[in-house]
A protein has these predicted regions:
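Catalytic cores of nucleic-acid ligases and guanylyltransferases
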Residues: 1-160
């Protein structure tokens, strides 16, 4: 198993904790949608540690969705089915891979909590939705305006 960035760069050797976890996945092959996360000394996500390659050995993967499993394309399957399958294949992969639970219900409260934790934001998905790359009417991305990564992204957009 290998770890790739969105543009296709092989990052397997850069993140040893994730690479070790990939070897423990319960599958021959898979494509997981996730995000590499490094935490600060308080246990909160630190964009700076990822950006400046600090503590690469402590970076783990938050697994959000499962796109392909053992050669089978799962993108048309409902989100709740993909999440259940994802949970079962990453169950033994901690601490390098962490399953991102699907929280049903009170989106505004979850978003407020994510903002208090300094997270970049959340993505709300309809539980019966198919997987689509890019934007989807079934997925709503809400960004924390106080997050350093979001602020930097806005500044870069304004400078164009």
């Amino acid at each position: 198993m290998r770890l790739y960035s969105r543009p296709g760069n092989d990052l397997t050797h850069r993140f040893p904790l994730i690479a070790d976890a990939l070897a423990r996945l319960r599958s021959r092959s898979c494509i997981i949608d996730g995000e590499a996360v490094a935490c600060d000394d308080n246990g909160l996500a630190s964009f700076e540690r990822i950006r400046y390659r600090q503590h690469d050995g402590d970076v783990f993967l938050y697994a959000f969705d499962l796109i392909e499993l053992n050669g089978d394309d799962l993108r048309r399957d409902p989100l709740q089915v993909r999440k259940a399958t994802l949970g079962s294949i990453v169950a033994k992969a901690r601490p390098g891979i962490r399953f991102n639970e699907h929280i049903e219900g009170d989106g505004p409260t979850v978003f407020a909590h994510a903002c208090k934790m300094g997270l970049e934001g959340i993505v709300s998905k309809r539980k019966y939705s198919a997987y689509r790359s890019g934007r989807s009417p079934d997925w709503l991305k809400m960004k924390n305006p106080a997050c350093a990564a979001v602020t930097r992204e806005a500044e870069e957009d304004w400078s164009k």
